[in-house]
């Protein structure tokens, strides 16, 4: 138990002192990080955690990893008959899952692999999924999902996903 913890911030590092302990962490300027405009994300929509787990787990195994066709390195969300459909392919395998969740008619986004894996990791960390509150929103460039106290903001992959209905 320390009575006080001190943070000292400089341009290149953050020093943390508590009792006899001193930690120095490197710091990067905020201008080195991309600006993500989350103001224009549209309406937040609710989604049950069980539905999101199914959307990810049933299709993500077929997601490409470091493919030159960058649009395959993510999970494609779109709508079919008013329901959210998730599709992944690496060019050899294709997985498609039509959920029971209602989706926007214009929904057609590709969420990057790293964001999908992180969302899946967070969802799997909860022992009782019925207590998990989830809201998502998106625009043409950004996907935003809130899972209880977690907030994930990810750039979307640009490009057109292949027509998987012709396979």
Segment roles from a protein language model:
Residues 1-167:
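Structural preference for solvent-exposed beta-strand-turn elements
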């Amino acid at each position: 138990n320390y009575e006080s913890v001190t943070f000292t911030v400089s341009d290149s590092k953050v020093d943390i002192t508590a009792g006899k302990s001193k930690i120095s962490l490197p710091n990067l300027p905020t201008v080195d990080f991309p600006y993500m405009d989350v103001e224009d994300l549209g309406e937040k929509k609710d989604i049950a955690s069980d539905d999101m787990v199914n959307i990810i787990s049933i299709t993500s195994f077929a997601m490409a990893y470091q493919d030159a066709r960058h649009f395959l390195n993510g999970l494609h969300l779109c709508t079919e008959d008013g329901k959210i459909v998730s599709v992944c392919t690496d060019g050899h395998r294709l997985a498609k899952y039509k959920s029971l969740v209602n989706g926007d008619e214009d929904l057609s986004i590709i969420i990057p692999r790293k964001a999908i894996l992180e969302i899946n990791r967070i969802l799997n960390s909860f022992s009782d999924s019925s207590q998990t509150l989830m809201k998502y929103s998106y625009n043409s460039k950004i996907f935003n999902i809130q899972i209880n106290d977690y907030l994930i903001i990810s750039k979307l992959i640009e490009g057109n996903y292949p027509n998987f209905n012709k396979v």
